[in-house]
Amino acid sequence: MGAKSKQYFNIFVFVISLIFFDQLSKYLVVKYVKLGSIYFSFFDNFFRIIHVRNTGILFSMGSDIHYSLKKIFFIAMPIFILIFVFSLALKEKNCITRISLLLIFSGGVGNIIDRLFRPSGVVDFLDFKFYGIFGLDRWPTFNFADSYVVIGMILFLVYDFFIKRKVLNT
């Protein structure tokens, strides 16, 4: 196997593993946790597994818009954006940037799978107490795909704003 083939294989395994873990976790929540109920909580209700559905996007924004507009804004546009992100990841030479882009891609694909095959919405289940920060008693419930996107974005921004600029300035 050539170096380029091995690189593509590693990318494939990384992405498929993340998407599989996201979809498996959602499958288990759907199978074992009744919609709207709390499966269990830890540390005096700090962390809970709860089964909710999100028909909107980030923090349920847009859940009220018409179904045909949702198809455009929540499925079609993200698919084009994800294709672009994936193509950037394949071309990227820097490992940190590539991983951050692949995390964003994998999370986006995980949630698009839900939008395509779960008409009642994206499965969210990770729920944390937020102690009134930003006026929130609890952080909006999310899933692993959401985490991949957020971690990928943070990694990308930290690298781009702090590490890469520091290297370029020396």
Curated annotation (Swiss-Prot):
Its main location: membrane. GO terms for molecular function: aspartic-type endopeptidase activity. It is found in: Cell inner membrane. One of its GO terms (cellular component) is plasma membrane. One of its GO terms (biological process) is proteolysis. The active site is at D124, D146. It is a multi-pass membrane protein. It holds the Pfam family Peptidase_A8. The chain crosses the membrane at residues 9-29, 72-92, 95-117, 143-163. Its EC number is 3.4.23.36. It catalyses: Release of signal peptides from bacterial membrane prolipoproteins. Hydrolyzes -Xaa-Yaa-Zaa-|-(S,diacylglyceryl)Cys-, in which Xaa is hydrophobic (preferably Leu), and Yaa (Ala or Ser) and Zaa (Gly or Ala) have small, neutral side chains. The keyword Nucleus does not apply. The keyword Transcription regulation does not apply. Keywords: Aspartyl protease, Cell inner membrane, Cell membrane, Hydrolase, Membrane, Protease, Transmembrane, Transmembrane helix. Pathway: Protein modification; lipoprotein biosynthesis (signal peptide cleavage). Belongs to the peptidase A8 family. This protein specifically catalyzes the removal of signal peptides from prolipoproteins. This is Lipoprotein signal peptidase. It comes from Borrelia garinii subsp. bavariensis (strain ATCC BAA-2496 / DSM 23469 / PBi).
